[in-house]
């Protein structure tokens, strides 16, 4: 599962997830992409589930790029523990997603197969997504 090798600080504050994605909003590496149309938090497990769904559907053909990385730690206190006594321990990692962000990219497969593969990955995501193609200038 994806998570940072090391961080400056173990825990982070919540912060707000506002605005649109100005970086990572275009298909850069592949021919087709899965782009978020809503905002949210995607966990490392969800990213991996989406990757597996895509790779199982396209079988041997094509190459996949994961364009998001879970770099935000989410903490949780154990069950039945009273309030206070400090912040809980890191439970899992998430990537914060703004509308417009490209989550996955594929190349080397037909458009129809790419659409089906991304539909399967989109079912695993907690954000709404859309299929996008590389814009040739």
UniProtKB/Swiss-Prot annotation:
Pfam families xrefs: Ribosomal_L16 (PF00252)
GO BP, sorted A to Z: translation
Coiled coil, from the record: none
GO molecular function, one term: tRNA binding
InterPro entries assigned: Ribosomal_uL16 (IPR047873), Ribosomal_uL16_bact-type (IPR000114), Ribosomal_uL16_CS (IPR020798), Ribosomal_uL16_dom (IPR016180), Ribosomal_uL16_sf (IPR036920)
PANTHER family, alphabetized: 50S/60S RIBOSOMAL PROTEIN L16, LARGE RIBOSOMAL SUBUNIT PROTEIN UL16M
Reported function: Binds 23S rRNA and is also seen to make contacts with the A and possibly P site tRNAs.
Subunit relationships: Part of the 50S ribosomal subunit.
Protein's recorded name: Large ribosomal subunit protein uL16
Organism, as annotated: Francisella philomiragia subsp. philomiragia (strain ATCC 25017 / CCUG 19701 / FSC 153 / O#319-036)
Lineage: Bacteria, Pseudomonadati, Pseudomonadota, Gammaproteobacteria, Thiotrichales
Gene: rplP
């Amino acid at each position: 599962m994806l998570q940072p090798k090391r961080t400056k600080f173990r825990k982070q504050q919540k912060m707000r997830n506002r605005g649109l994605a100005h970086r990572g909003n275009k298909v850069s590496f592949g021919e087709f992409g899965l782009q978020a149309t809503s905002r949210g938090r995607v966990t490392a497990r969800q990213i991996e589930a989406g990757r597996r769904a895509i790779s199982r559907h396209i079988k041997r053909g094509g190459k996949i790029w994961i364009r998001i990385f879970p770099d935000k730690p989410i903490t949780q206190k154990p069950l039945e523990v009273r309030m206070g006594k400090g912040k809980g321990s890191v439970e899992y990692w998430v990537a914060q997603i703004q509308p417009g962000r490209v989550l996955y990219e594929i190349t080397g497969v037909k458009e129809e197969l790419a659409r089906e593969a991304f539909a399967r990955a989109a079912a695993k995501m907690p954000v709404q997504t859309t299929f996008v193609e590389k814009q040739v200038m």
